[in-house]
Each structure stands twice: as structure tokens, then as C-alpha cells.
Amino acid sequence: MAKVEVCNMSGEKVSEIDLADEIFGVEVKGSVLHEVVVMQLANRRAGTVCVKNRSDVRGSTRKLYRQKGTGRARKGDIKSPVLRGGGVVFGPHPRDYSYKVPKKVRKAALKMALSSKLADNSLKVVDNMDLPEIKTKAFAEAMAAMGVDTALIVTTGEEKNLELSARNVKGVKVMPTAGLNVYDILKYGNLILAQGAIEAIEGRLL
């Protein structure tokens, strides 16, 4: 088991905690992380893009002029894709981009993402993240004391004061343990876990 320092919001060490090797000490495979991140991004796509084909464009279906004898190139109706304002050929239409990778792969990727943060010394554990009041300045000072600029902060539950204080700070995201995912772990430079969140993560992944 890896030992990690537990600090307070002032960056001072208060204790140590053991992290399970089955979650925070697994071999990191880039291909697995890539597979899950691509899935997450695909699932976030709205899929609402839509263009008009020649049957959707408003206009007459009358042939513009006769087929032969004019000396000009042959043309159909005004909605033809070769004309300005005509329909689009094989254009995008609303569709669902979401898909799933196996549950075991998603679970393994989450363990790998957590392990990568520990291996890079980018994982910090904080004993208590509860702020007495909503104050962005106080939050920014706490981040500076911990030596962190960008971070994903994972709380045990809803920390309203913390969420509102961090809302306007660039490069910081606060989320409860239930929302923990591979993409957000990898996106932010550091991972800050509430001490109570570790128990929830171990309960979810062990």
C-alpha cells in the first residue's frame, strides 16, 4: 500500500493514509484510457446537427429547362445539389453517437487514471474541504498553499460553499465521488481527494 500525506486546506500535513494498490497502484495502459475517454466524449455529443437534402429544400420540382437543344448543361429542378441554395448530398442528420464499452474496461480505466495521478505525484488528500463561507479569495489562497493551480476536487457529497467559491477559478472543477470519471481525472493537472472520498472510491472499485 502506498502512503500519502493528508493535509488541511492550509497545506499543512495532519496525518497519513494508506491507498490500496488494487486501485492506486495498477499498471497504466494508454490504449484502455484512450478507449474510455473517446467513449465519454462521444456520449456527450448532442448529435443535433442537421442539413437539408434536396427533398427538404423548399422549391418547385419543375425542370428548369428542357433536356436537349439549348446548348447548356442539363439541369433538373432548382433544388439540385449542384446549384446554389440546393440540397446537400449525404449531409449530417440527427443521430445518437453514444455507445458503451464493457463495464470491466471502464472500471479498469478509472483505476489506471487514479494510479497515473499517484505515480506523477499529482494526487493530494485533504482532511476537510468544508469552507466556512463562500469566498473565492479564500479558496484561491488554499490552492496556492497546497501548491496547486489546476485541479479536479472530489468531495464526499455536496459541498455548496466549496463549489460556489471555486466556480469562478479557472482550471478547477469540483465534483462528488459519484461523478468521478476518467476524462475529468486526466483533463486536470492535479487530483485533490477528500479523505472521506477515498473510502467511497474503494467501495466502488474494490
From Swiss-Prot:
The keyword RNA-binding applies. Keywords: Ribonucleoprotein, Ribosomal protein, RNA-binding, rRNA-binding. GO terms for cellular component: ribonucleoprotein complex; ribosome. The keyword Protein biosynthesis does not apply. HAMAP family: Ribosomal_uL4_B. Part of the 50S ribosomal subunit. One of the primary rRNA binding proteins, this protein initially binds near the 5'-end of the 23S rRNA. It is important during the early stages of 50S assembly. It makes multiple contacts with different domains of the 23S rRNA in the assembled 50S subunit and ribosome. Belongs to the universal ribosomal protein uL4 family. This is Large ribosomal subunit protein uL4. It comes from Desulfatibacillum aliphaticivorans. The lineage of its organism: Bacteria, Pseudomonadati, Thermodesulfobacteriota, Desulfobacteria, Desulfobacterales. The gene is rplD.
